[in-house]
Amino acid sequence: AIPMAYKEDIRVMLNHYIATIEAEIGDVEKDFFMHLETTDMPELFIPAEKAKVLIQALYACPHGMTAMSKTMPGLVETSTNLASVKMKEDEKGAFVEINTSQRSSIESKKHDIKQMVECALALACDEVTHGDGYPGWAPNPQSPLLEVTKKAYQDLFAAEPKVLAIHAGLECGLFLEK
């Protein structure tokens, strides 16, 4: 919430900010819009000082691709996603829940980026917890399963298959652990 005394200053600042964002992403995000309106005080809110620290922590939190594969050109190796920020309430009161996910073809790199995220969010959050996610899985170009699959493709289509690796949450790492 912004005090009414600052409403016009905020409107001018926000309109300038919107114009900047539109100039940066307008060709890609054609439906982007931001809107400022006067409303009643919400039931759930974050005190101003806590909100400032939360915004700083979110700004410091890594998001996106953090490393490319050194063995497979063009393949993202490690990434992190700042997925959602939600206001919630329980018996203790209002709190903010932040969900992130990390992926990597190298398990140790996944844990490293998870620690970076935790360090950034710990600046503002009373508690930071992690789910397990998918284990790291490095593509294996010499995999026996890949050879069987390539041969089956060649037999069916009389053509060499195009084999690529992708960066995604894959069950392959789960299968590999078994």
Residue ranges and their predicted role:
Residues 1, 35, 97-101:
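Beta-strand secondary-structure signal
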Residues 2-13, 33-81, 86-89, 107-112, ...:
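An extended, acidic, His-containing surface patch that forms the Zn2+-binding/catalytic region
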Residues 6-22, 112-121:
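Short amphipathic alpha-helices in soluble, non-transmembrane regions
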Residues 19, 26, 49-50:
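Extended beta-strand/beta-hairpin segments
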Residues 20-23, 60, 123, 155:
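A structural signal for alpha-helix termini and helix-coil/disorder junctions
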Residues 25-29, 39:
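Extended acidic/polar, glycine-enriched regions
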Residues 90-94:
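Short, solvent-exposed loop/turn segments that connect beta-strands within catalytic domains
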Residues 96-125:
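C-terminal, non-catalytic macromolecule-binding modules
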